[in-house]
Amino acid sequence: MQECMGSAGFEKREIVNIFDDPIFEGCVDGEIIEMARVRMTTIPEPTGCVPHKVVYSDIDYNGHCNSCRYLQTMTDAYLPDYYGKKVRLDINYSKEAMLGETLQTYYLIVPDGVQYQQKNGQGETSCSAKITIL
């Protein structure tokens, strides 16, 4: 079995560049663009808000909302027109959402894309994201 990313990143729980792994040789289409990290901020005055109740099909085997579903519910709330364009997605998972919880998806349309923030019933941020059109 091939060892992925040298396991050093996993043992130390550090950020690693996955494209340094030999498994990705020949898989990257075009150049890799180095980008600075994006700081997630609270949305002071959202453009809109859409509720989503976490249902059975949203949860994973741990009983938490599946990580892909956060992004799906965000883009269901508002999807920027980025078809055929390069985009950058920054996402920050803060607190797990559980079966039966209702998440409020706040979104803010910004000049270069859209910023999202999902909050649970206690007002805690579960997930935040930004889609930037490059």
Label each region the model flagged.
Residues 1-42, 97-100, 108-134:
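HotDog/MaoC-like acyl-thioester-processing domains
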Residues 90:
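Short aromatic/hydrophobic contact patches that present stacked aromatics
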Residues 9-87:
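Hot-dog-fold acyl-thioester-processing enzymes
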